[in-house]
Structures are given as C-alpha cells and as structure tokens.
Amino acid sequence: MESLLRFLALLLLRGAVAEGPAKKVLTLEGDLVLGGLFPVHQKGGPAEECGPVNEHRGIQRLEAMLFALDRINRDPHLLPGVRLGAHILDSCSKDTHALEQALDFVRASLSRGADGSRHICPDGSYATLSDAPTAITGVIGGSYSDVSIQVANLLRLFQIPQISYASTSAKLSDKSRYDYFARTVPPDFFQAKAMAEILRFFNWTYVSTVASEGDYGETGIEAFELEARARNICVATSEKVGRAMSRAAFEGVVRALLQKPSARVAVLFTRSEDARELLAATQRLNASFTWVASDGWGALESVVAGSERAAEGAITIELASYPISDFASYFQNLDPWNNSRNPWFREFWEERFRCSFRQRDCAAHSLRAVPFEQESKIMFVVNAVYAMAHALHNMHRALCPNTTRLCDAMRPVNGRRLYKDFVLNVKFDAPFRPADTDDEVRFDRFGDGIGRYNIFTYLRAGNGRYRYQKVGYWAEGLTLDTSIIPWASPSAGTLPASRCSEPCLQNEVKSVQPGEVCCWLCIPCQPYEYRLDEFTCADCGLGYWPNASLTGCFELPQEYIRWGDAWAVGPVTIACLGALATLFVLGVFVRHNATPVVKASGRELCYILLGGVFLCYCMTFIFIAKPSTAVCTLRRLGLGTAFSVCYSALLTKTNRIARIFGGAREGAQRPRFISPASQVAICLALISGQLLIVAAWLVVEAPGIGKETAPERREVVTLRCNHRDASMLGSLAYNVLLIALCTLYAFKTRKCPENFNEAKFIGFTMYTTCIIWLAFLPIFYVTSSDYRVQTTTMCVSVSLSGSVVLGCLFAPKLHIILFQPQKNVVSHRAPTSRFGSAAPRASANLGQGSGSQLVPTVCNGREVVDSTTSSL
C-alpha cells in the first residue's frame, strides 16, 4: 500500500514540476539535510496564492533556523565532523500550498524504499529522478496546525521525522495517525484548559467563541468547549471565520456576537490574520467585547495595529518563552548583501523599509536603526533544530562509534529508528536559556512539548499608547496578578460580567432551563428549608431550622413558659394571692370553728371546698412549670380533681338544701343522708368519679412530653405535654356535669335563707362560674396555636374559678365572722320539728315559757319552721 501511495506521489510531483512556475527555495549544502517549512508569506486572496511577506512568523523564524544551524555546525561537541544542511520552503500560510511545497522533501525518497532498495516500475525498470535533491533527514515545521497535519500525512509515508515549533492542534498527539511527528510546543488542550480557568477565575460563565477554519481553530475550540463544560461555562454562540472571508463577512460575525448581549466575553481560537480582521470589523462597527484569545493572537503587535480601541482589555495567551539575545544581534546585523542565502530577504527588506532596489534607495537602511521585536516562538524554532541535531548526534554515536564522519549505517538515515529511538528520547538543556532559567527540552510519549503559557492583557498606558502587559502564567495551574489589569484591579470597581443569569441570592436556588445549564430562574426557598445544593431546597424537618448561611440545619430550642416571663408573672401573682387568701379563710374558719356561721355552713364540706380552692391556685404553678412526665401527670390529675373537689362539695351542699326544703314542702319525713358523715361520703364519691376518669385517661394515653410545631409557625418548637386538647375536654366534661347540676340546685334553692342565705350565695357562685367556663373553653381551644396564651388563659381561669368560690361563698361568711360578730350567736327556737307545720298553739304561746321562739322560714313560697341553728 505504501509503495502505491509513493508511486502516486511521484506522479503528482512530476506534474507539479512540469506545470508549476519557478519557486524560491533556500538550500544549504550539508552531509545531512534538514527540511524547513515556514510561512514566509501570509496567505493570499482568492486570486493569489501568497500574500505579503510575514516578518515575524516567516522571516524571523526562518532566520532562527539558519542561526541554529550555524551554531550547531560550529559546535565541536555536537555532531563533530558532520555538517547539517537545509532545504527551506515557503508555506504561504496555507495547507494546500504547503503540501505542494513539501513534495520537495520526498523527491529523493521516491526512488527508494524504506530499506534503501530502489523502486521498480511496472515495466521492470528502476524509478529515477534526474534532478533529485539530497535526501531529507528530517523536517522542521510547519507553523500552523493544518499545515503540519497535511505535511505529516505525506512525510509519514516516507518515514521522515518532523518537529514543529508552533503547531498546537490536539490531533497531532494521535500517534496512530501522526507517528513521525513531534513538537517543541504543548498541544492545544493545555491552552484550552488555561483559557477555561481564566474564565472561571473571573466568573465568566456565558461566552461566545470564534474559531478559524482548519485544525488549529476547530480542534482548539473543541478542546476549550470540553474544558468549559467541565467548569459549568456555557457557549452562547459559536462562529467560524474562513480563509477568504470578506470584510462584510467578518462584520457579520461581529453582529452575530452582538446578538448575545449577555455574553460580553468572546473566546478566540484563531490565526493571527483572522484575529486582525475580526478586530478591525469590531472597530468599524463600534462594538466592544472582552477578548480571551489563544496564542494565534498572542502578543503580536500586527494583530492589533489599527484596532487598538477594539482590542483594549483583551486577555491573550502566549507560549512561555524567553528572547534569545544572540539571535537579536544576529538578525539586526543582517542585510541583503550579507544574507544572500535567504532568497526572500530582499523582498522583506523592501517591504520593511518601503524602498526599492531598482531605485537604489534601500542601501541606506539598517535593521539596527529600527525597533526590533523578537517573535515569541523563536526559542521553539531553535529548540526544534537542536532537538533534531541531538537526536542525530545520539544516533551517530550509536551507529558510527568509531568515526566522526557518517558511516554506511547512516547512509541513508533510517527515519523510523531516528524518530522512535532518538527523537522521542532526546533530553537536553535548552540552548541560549537565561542563567536563572531551568528549561529542559524533551518530549512526552506523544511527542509533545511541556506546557507553560504566559498571560497578557492589552492595555492603554499612562502616555496614551497601547501595549501588552504580562499579568500571569499557567503551568498546570493559573497564576494571575489582577492588580495589573485595569478593569480587574481593586480600584476599578465591578468586574465585567458575562453570564446568562444573575447569581441567585443566598436563600434562592437555580431552576435551570432545559438545555441551558448557565441560564436559570432563581426560586426562593421556604423559610424552613436549607440549600442542599445550588439547585435544591431541602426541608429541615420539624423541630429544625436553617442556619444563617442556609448550608444546614440546627435544632430549634424548645420553648415553654419560664418563671420570669411576663406570661407567668401575672398568673403566678394571682395564684399566690389566692392561695394566701385561701389559707387566711381556712385559718379564720378553724379559729371560729364552733361559731354558728361556721357550723351552719357545714364545716366538713367547707374545709373540703377550701382544699379544692387551694388546689385550683396550686394548679397555676403546675401549668407554669417546665413540662416533664411528672408535671404532665400532675396536670391531668390536678386540673380535673381541683374542679371536682370544689363542685362536688357545692353540689352536695345544694343537693342537701334542695332535699331538705323539698321534703318540707311535701311534709315528708326527714331526708336521708344529710348528716355530716353522709355529706362527706357523698362528696368523696363524687370526687372519686373524677379520679376514675383521670386514671382511665392516664392508662389510655400515657403521660409524656412532646415537641409541637404549628404549620404556620415552624420556627417555634413548643415543649408540651403529649395529651390532646380533645382528651382534656373529655376529662372536664365530668366537671361540666357537676357545674350544671350544682347550678340547677342553686337556682331551685335561691330563695331559701337558711344558713345566712347560703343558697343565694351558692347561686351567685355557680352563675359566675358558668360565665367563666363559657368564656374559658372557647378561648382555650381557639388559642391552641399559641401555648403562652393558652397556658395563661388556663391558669387565670382556674384561679378565677377558685376566687369566685372565695368571693361569693366565703366572703359573706367572713364578713359576719370578722365585722358582724353579733350575728354569729345561737338563736333560741322552739323545739318543733323542721318538717312539721307551726301549730296555732305554739303561735299563741309565742314568747312564753323558757324563752324559746319559733322562727318562720319561707322557702320557695312555702313557710317552714326551723328549730336549729346549725345545719349539721
């Protein structure tokens, strides 16, 4: 197959030689000849093959190869006895033209196989080339990646090693296709990574891209987009610039970029000529972008000339290199008379000084008299030539150990062995490096150089002139000094923005639009949610609340009424005063235990009633106390029991009065169970009913504590007893029944003045109690969402219930005992039974005898006679 391809190349070569015009070639004689391929001219327009002379990337790089060859040939330690020659061609910055030129490199190989044997034509004769040049040992070049790719595809057929000094396409690292290619520069994916890191450094997440057609631009921008996606950077629009685009076409590209106003940053992976035209179109349209450009732009003045305003603020990348002072001296001393070996130098001279040798006005000029800017890749050209020389030197030492001349083993040079065994394994200190620089020339297993880039910004200096300023470098990581960049320095204020959507606030997450990872809507999290990530709000859960940074949750403190709270001070004060008042009443009753008022009130039931009132006041302290299992048990037990003690005693009293006077109306016998012991037993039986209900409640719903959070106030966690408010209502239902019955009896006996009108006062007590309960129960259940209001309502209501008993029932008795003692005496009455009607005889004898008198009593419209003072 390779023989067939070589034969086809031979036919193409003969056609090119027969039909093509005469071309310029730089030839230097030598024992071993190195080919050279340089863009001496820029690419031409549609009607011409080549354009103007390319001073920096063409002439300077070509002269750098000649400079390196001169130094090598004079070096007694590198290839001594072997002289290196050159066969240098012009690529005109076009891959097709370069491929035509590169056929010169393989002409000498077309008549021989890889093993040196001569090719045999189909008719049996040997293939011959009458004007075949010296065989090319290796090639230095080309510059552009698409040129190197085309040439590499040709050279590999003839096993000719190739070392490029500027081609950075990632495709060239594929050793299955470019197995004789190496380069002293790193591949573009390092540069693409550096550019993506620059964008991420400035938080530019939405950018446009422009790439030159061809392998350099297209593969470079593909590598950049891959690195950008890994860093969540999105491309708004991707544009390409062609080889022969008109000014209008470049303006169309700029207008396309302007269609994405949020993408203020444009990433360029273009050749220098395309970058120059794009900047010119931008300036004509008075547009403005922040450019981030590859080494195709680099730090070239020719790119920005005439478009300085459009280029201002750009960030560009250039392979890290250092100027070679010896080359600067060499180049500045050149002129057309001492550099006749370079056939393009006279043309360069005329364009550089705008003179003409026909008019003899070029002799007065000198390169030493004009500013000199050394092209940034001169170092890589020199390193490429030295790498080939070191590889040949090592090969010579291995194959020709006994001579400094070429031996038969290197006639011709085996290109496969030269590349595999010597070029890829070469390692030496870079020539002409500064003393403080540690620069080693070597290749990795893909034939690539080591990656390090300098980063520049194009700025306007204080004198109004524009210049490139180095602001950092990239070597497996980004280092930037933003204080040098005018728009990024601290004094500049806000950085230029290039993003599709504004950053979300701390309490918001991104709702990404389909297909646009850089475009989103900001959705606020709920107050009880934290940010699980930048796209998700997560519920903290009941009892937890997001921290200040919304990165997690913390457990909310448990809230309950504390003794020092305003919500506790009022109820506790009322309870304390009520308890003291109860103890005072108890003390007065005990002190006057044998007096008629106390005896007539039913001492045993009064003491039980005072105990219930005191328990009502004590319940305030239990409800204010911090909830615990014991406290919750006491709450359940104490609340219903306190009420049942009070209302059981009152019910027993009113029931007794009702039965007594009910029997008197009907003339019945003395009612049963009206003795003190019976009354206490009835009261205790009624209380035990409440105790049984509470006991069942405690069994069915075990007491304990729980955390409660209202849906509308999740930031508040209340420490509460675990019983339900409905179950509390069930416990109080029994007391409601007692109150209803007690109120009924109080109403029935309201006109009975027995025992100092006690029935009337019991009625007042029950009426007021009903009002309190009718107000308390709705408030208690309506305020269930606010534990403080509910607890305070409960405490005040319970205390009021006790206070009503004290005020309405005991206060009148206390008033008689303390302030009307004359009423607190025994009244003598006739020994007539309470349950018999007063006889006329007794009435006639009223006031006679022993002084006893009958006191008529009217109860509910019936007159009865009471012969006793004490009810018990």
Curated annotation (Swiss-Prot):
PROSITE patterns: G_PROTEIN_RECEP_F3_1, G_PROTEIN_RECEP_F3_2, G_PROTEIN_RECEP_F3_3, G_PROTEIN_RECEP_F3_4. Disruption phenotype: Grm2-deletion mice are healthy and show no obvious alteration in physical characteristics. However, they show reduced mossy fiber long-term depression and locomotor hyperactivity under novel environmental and stressful conditions. Furthermore, grm2-null mutation leads to altered responses in several behavioral tests, including a significant increase in cocaine-induced behaviors associated with reinforcement and addiction. Its main location: membrane. Disulfide bonds join C50-C92, C234-C518, C355-C362, C400-C407, C500-C519, C504-C522, C525-C537, C540-C553, C632-C721. Residues 1-18 form the signal peptide. It is found in: Cell membrane; Synapse; Cell projection, Dendrite. GO terms for molecular function: calcium channel regulator activity; group II metabotropic glutamate receptor activity; scaffold protein binding. Detected in neurons in brain cortex (at protein level). Residues 677-685 are annotated as: Important for interaction with HTR2A. GO terms for cellular component: astrocyte projection; axon; dendrite; glutamatergic synapse; neuron projection; postsynaptic membrane; presynaptic membrane. The keyword Cell membrane applies. InterPro entries: ANF_lig-bd_rcpt, GPCR_3, GPCR_3_9-Cys_dom, GPCR_3_9-Cys_sf, GPCR_3_C, GPCR_3_CS, GPCR_3_mGluR2, GPCR_3_mtglu_rcpt. GO terms for biological process: behavioral response to nicotine; cellular response to stress; gene expression; glutamate secretion; intracellular glutamate homeostasis; long-term synaptic depression; positive regulation of phosphatidylinositol 3-kinase/protein kinase B signal transduction; presynaptic modulation of chemical synaptic transmission. Glycans are attached at N203, N286, N338, N402, N547. Keywords: Cell membrane, Cell projection, Disulfide bond, G-protein coupled receptor, Glycoprotein, Membrane, Receptor, Signal, Synapse, Transducer, Transmembrane, Transmembrane helix. Residues 590-604, 652-679, 748-760, 820-872 are cytoplasmic. Belongs to the G-protein coupled receptor 3 family. PANTHER family: METABOTROPIC GLUTAMATE RECEPTOR. Forms heterodimers with GRM3 or GRM4. Interacts with GNAI1. Interacts with TAMALIN. Interacts with HTR2A. This is Metabotropic glutamate receptor 2. It comes from Mus musculus (Mouse).
